[in-house]
């Protein structure tokens, strides 16, 4: 039997950025091969730094998928844990917990051959490159494409034992925005001979707020945030260029596309009114809204509520993003939150998960996957 805490701590020490998860993949493969040895109904394939583990069912009428992400973040860890990472990277989003739970589930579900097929996906690059989309579009699944897909994300403000989801949208769709205004630099004393890109960028940031207040239906949700502006070099030089970096978030793809359209129109309009040029990049990629399948979500919620020790919470959507949304746009499925009881939030340098969640998650989720694989 594998040691979940030891595995989690080993993974926690080797976080890697998306599509660079070579040590992580090597370690995962070591544990996977330890679990599946002498089991002829299991096959393993790799795709770049991703891993697919396929359990062929004795009847195989459908394939149930379980997805976990494996990448870390470019964050310097400040937890002071004895097993803290020391390479300027950190599993500050809890993917070390995700991977460990997935390995525990693989061990549990591979004790005997299931009736239905099972696919365990260890997906790279959730944080930066939408690895789920890359794998789907790149044909990584081949003949193993699931009929239903399930996955989780840890949530610090929920307690161990809490599982939270809903029958609708769980996470927002996100779109990254990079916008550069290009004017003409000059001396601060002679503004009439220059064209101030900083002023244009500042004007744009205020104007773009009208998208949410005047273009989006008040009953819908959207966020347009610019968290970074770079312009100028010193106090007495008018900036030739101004760079803005922001994000769009919405609970439906329709609203996301509307927001992208209006942002583009406003950027072009401001540029024209200031007689400037712009360079605008909108990058949504695979970060679509995470839309749970209502029927499958109800089934999952009823199961956790009635058949396990989980405290099932029907939770409101969150404006966080997750690239599992792309896979759920292709394959019906469900994502849910898993409580880890951490005082520090996701992406924090001090985020710490309560390791008691490992045994709980493997037991409760294992019961559900066993139900899907053998009794459903």
Swiss-Prot record:
Catalytic residues, chain numbering: 69, 127
UniProtKB keywords: Amino-acid biosynthesis, Diaminopimelate biosynthesis, Hydrolase, Lysine biosynthesis
Pathway(s) it belongs to: Amino-acid biosynthesis; L-lysine biosynthesis via DAP pathway; LL-2,6-diaminopimelate from (S)-tetrahydrodipicolinate (acetylase route): step 3/3
Molecular function in Gene Ontology: N-acetyldiaminopimelate deacetylase activity
Reaction catalysed by this enzyme: N-acetyl-(2S,6S)-2,6-diaminopimelate + H2O = (2S,6S)-2,6-diaminopimelate + acetate
A biological process term (GO) from this entry: lysine biosynthetic process via diaminopimelate
Broad enzyme group: hydrolase
Gene3D superfamilies for the chain: 3.30.70.360, Zn peptidases
Enzyme Commission number(s) from the entry: 3.5.1.47
Keyword field contains RNA-binding: no
InterPro entries: AcetylDAP_deacetylase (IPR023905), Amidohydrolase (IPR017439), Bact_exopeptidase_dim_dom (IPR036264), Peptidase_M20 (IPR002933), Peptidase_M20_dimer (IPR011650)
Function of the protein: Catalyzes the conversion of N-acetyl-diaminopimelate to diaminopimelate and acetate.
Protein family: Belongs to the peptidase M20A family. N-acetyldiaminopimelate deacetylase subfamily.
Family matches, as NCBIfam families: amidohydrolases
PANTHER family hit by this protein: N-ACETYLDIAMINOPIMELATE DEACETYLASE, PEPTIDASE M20 FAMILY MEMBER
Name of this chain's protein: N-acetyldiaminopimelate deacetylase
Species per Swiss-Prot/TrEMBL record: Lactococcus lactis subsp. cremoris (strain SK11)
Phylogenetic placement of the source organism: Bacteria, Bacillati, Bacillota, Bacilli, Lactobacillales
